[in-house]
Amino acid sequence: MKKTLAIVLMVLCVFSAFAQGAAEGTAKDDQVKVVLLTDATGIDDKSFNAAAWRGILAFYGDEGAGRGTLYENITAQTSDDYVPNLKNAAEADWDLVITTGFTWGDAVTEVAALYPDQKFIIVDVDYLPKTDNLIQYIYEEEQGSYLVGVAAATQAKLDGIANPKFGFVGGVAGATITKFEIGYIEGVKSVYPDAEIVDYYVNNWGDPASAKTAAKSMYD
């Protein structure tokens, strides 16, 4: 998720400039303190969380030396931890609290209203109430998925597969993953307008084994 990394880098740079009154200086000198809150998949999810964490590390460029003082990540084991983790972060000495993914939407809305002086960012959401202390970022995920659909359908045509059937495996149904699926479907149908496309949702963001099983069953 290179866009997530780029967004986090951009926001940190802008925030740092404002925090210092646009004074000249390096990221290390600015002393902006940021915390990344993730779901149970953590910062090694190879997706939004990992990209956001890479963006933070790239911004500070200190090979992890500032972890715990300038930046940190906190992992929620369940969704019940979202609000408490956000409150704890807001009451700690962090300039910026970052969350990734639509599952944080309700919790961020609730806590941002309680801490109007704390700055929050949520990535992959743009439909929450607009407030001065909450920045929302969204992607056009369907564009990349459209190209994946075109590639899959084109390969099927090159392989001479008659009446090919296509599959889509998702994590948890919701606004974001639906955009991925719709883009994929439209890409497939640009090549095969009447193609049959089946989908399956694992209902978990951290269960690749089940996703693999579902994908394999589509082949079978």
How would you label these PLM feature ranges?
Residues 1-32:
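Short, low-complexity disordered leader/linker segments with a strong preference
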